Amino acid sequence: MNLYEAVYARKSVRCFAKEAVSGKIIESIRKFYQEMEGLFGGIETELVILENRKEKRSFMGFASVKAPYYLALYTSNQEKCMMNAGYVMQQLALYLCSRGLGSCFVGMNVLRPRLRKRGDKILACLLAFGKSKGSYTRKPVDARRQDLKELCIFKEKPRLWMTQLLEAARLAPSSMNSQPWRFVVYDNRIHVFSRKYKAKSGQLGRGTELNFGILFSNMMVVAEELWLDVDLIRLDEMNQKKYPNSQYVLSVILRA
């Protein structure tokens, strides 16, 4: 299985065996992270792999999902850092799936407060992982997701590649399965919106921003597999408009 196949097959796993993951695979996770690119340049991240097979580690706080291992991703605290972190961590989640391991995004309270910072970096997200007690994959039809017709407004008939990108987006995991995204679809571009929340700043909340990073990770993996030259751009003309029930995030545009 490669990352593209994992986009459609991966499911969140919450029950793990206490078996050890081989040192070779742990090292391959580090190497994959070191070689990958983030969504935005200039945002520093750091990945820490935490082992918890004996469940007596001093780093543990309250954990609703108990796993033998956790990936902790730290980031410099700057604009779009959470979206970038979501993008990076979803790439790692897909990689773990491709190596036969289950994973699940979990809350910050898994780690004790003293470990939620690392130098000048803040903890952005956590991923529980290990060998799954059951299946770590599922068919796309079994995913509990809204249909594309509920998520999209089609301004033009989409090409096949556009439909594949949208399906990858539809299958993206999100906190509490909130699926906050909405899409306005044209022949060669997708304008991505968030459901509007009551934020005084007019900015996406950090959790929502993380969700969109996960979404864009799925879309870019599929774009690369299909050899599509795609840009993620924030268009000024879209950003300046007022939308009563949604908030503009980014546009996915196919280069000519």
Regions inferred by a protein language model and the residue ranges of each:
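Acidic, surface-exposed loops and disordered segments
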Residues: 1-256
